């Protein structure tokens, strides 16, 4: 790793000046670029998250530093996914499930990076297709109602075999990495982030017998809604799904690549972020 990773692209999601993090991000950008230079890396800034505009820059980089929260990391991972480049997150924000380090730990991380003392985690990603339009999802693909009234009927197939019809507000198809995101809020299960599976979690289903379903990633899935619906990617991008138009979902041939500290332990992250084992007074 230390012989080939020399150019670091720095992702910063555009932030309005009224955002509470605006000033902190502006200061951090300059500090990070200076630190990368001091540590012997070439670097450049990407702050548009516009894949077409930044394609040549993405090809130039060996890895990407994502400055912000999990939303910034997700946007960067989707944008770089087809280029098969690793990313790592420097947390400036709230929860930071995906982040490798805090800002004050970046210098040590970069030094470990140069000495090949970090690890590469490869996670399952989703590849979706509607008609001729293809896309990737890192956390989840959601089929959601386009209008507030009524329920949305979604027929689900594994290959050509129908296995369920969901009737409710929609359906989450999550990756293991995304199982602690929207899926968890919808009472879906936590699945180890390095597992090879899909998690299907209904949203406010009309039937009280519907429960989340975990399927092996060897399945190719497709879904049809009885009326026009929205397909939401990682909570950041949307596509229209016409009535009875199939949405195809399968395991992406390219993995999501995250650089993390060697000491990172998934169960420790769950315990710290979700406050497992803490007393109710501490949680408040």
UniProtKB/Swiss-Prot annotation:
Catalytic positions?
70
UniProt key word Methyltransferase:
no
Please give the superkingdom of this protein's source: Bacteria
Per UniProt, subcellular location reads as: Cytoplasm
- Catalysed reaction equations from the record: NAD(+) + ATP = ADP + NADP(+) + H(+)
Q: Which GO terms describe its biological process?
A: NAD metabolic process; NADP biosynthetic process
Q: Where does this protein hold NAD(+)?
A: 70-71, 139-140, 167, 169, 177, 180-185, 236
EC number(s) per entry: 2.7.1.23
Keyword annotations? ATP-binding, Cytoplasm, Kinase, NAD, NADP, Nucleotide-binding, Transferase
Which GO cellular component terms are attached?
Answer: cytoplasm
A GO molecular-function annotation: ATP binding
Which cofactors go with this protein?
a divalent metal cation
Question: What is the documented function of this protein?
Answer: Involved in the regulation of the intracellular balance of NAD and NADP, and is a key enzyme in the biosynthesis of NADP. Catalyzes specifically the phosphorylation on 2'-hydroxyl of the adenosine moiety of NAD to yield NADP.
Q: Which PANTHER family does the entry link to?
A: NAD KINASE
Give the family from UniProt: Belongs to the NAD kinase family.
Q: Quote the protein name from its UniProt record.
A: NAD kinase
UniProt organism field? Helicobacter pylori (strain ATCC 700392 / 26695)
Which taxonomic lineage is given here? Bacteria, Pseudomonadati, Campylobacterota, Epsilonproteobacteria, Campylobacterales
């Amino acid at each position: 790793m230390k012989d080939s990773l020399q150019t670091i692209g720095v992702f910063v999601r555009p932030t309005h000046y009224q955002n509470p993090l605006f000033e902190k991000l502006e200061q951090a950008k300059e500090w990070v670029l200076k630190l990368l230079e001091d540590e012997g890396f070439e670097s450049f800034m990407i702050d548009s998250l516009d894949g077409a505009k930044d394609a040549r820059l993405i090809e130039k980089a060996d890895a990407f530093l994502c400055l912000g929260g999990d939303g910034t990391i997700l946007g960067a991972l989707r944008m770089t996914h087809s280029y098969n480049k690793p990313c790592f997150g420097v947390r400036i924000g709230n929860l930071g499930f995906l982040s490798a380090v805090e800002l004050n730990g970046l210098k040590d991380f970069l030094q470990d990076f140069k000495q090949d003392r970090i690890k590469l985690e490869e996670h399952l990603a989703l590849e979706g297709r509607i008609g001729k339009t293809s896309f990737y999802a890192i956390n989840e693909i959601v089929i959601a109602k386009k209008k507030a009234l009524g329920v949305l009927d979604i027929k689900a197939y594994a290959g050509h075999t129908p296995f369920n019809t969901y009737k409710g507000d929609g359906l989450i198809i999550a990756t293991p990495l995304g199982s602690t995101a929207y899926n968890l809020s919808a009472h879906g299960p936590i699945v180890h982030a390095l597992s090879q599976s899909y998690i299907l979690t209904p949203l406010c289903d009309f039937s009280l017998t519907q429960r989340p379903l975990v399927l092996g990633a060897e399945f190719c899935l497709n879904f049809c809604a009885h009326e026009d619906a929205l397909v939401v990617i990682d909570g950041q991008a949307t596509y229209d799904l016409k009535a009875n138009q199939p949405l195809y979902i399968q395991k992406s041939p390219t993995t999501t690549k995250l650089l993390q500290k060697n000491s990172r332990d998934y169960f420790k992250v769950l315990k710290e972020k979700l406050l497992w084992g803490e007393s109710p007074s501490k949680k408040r």
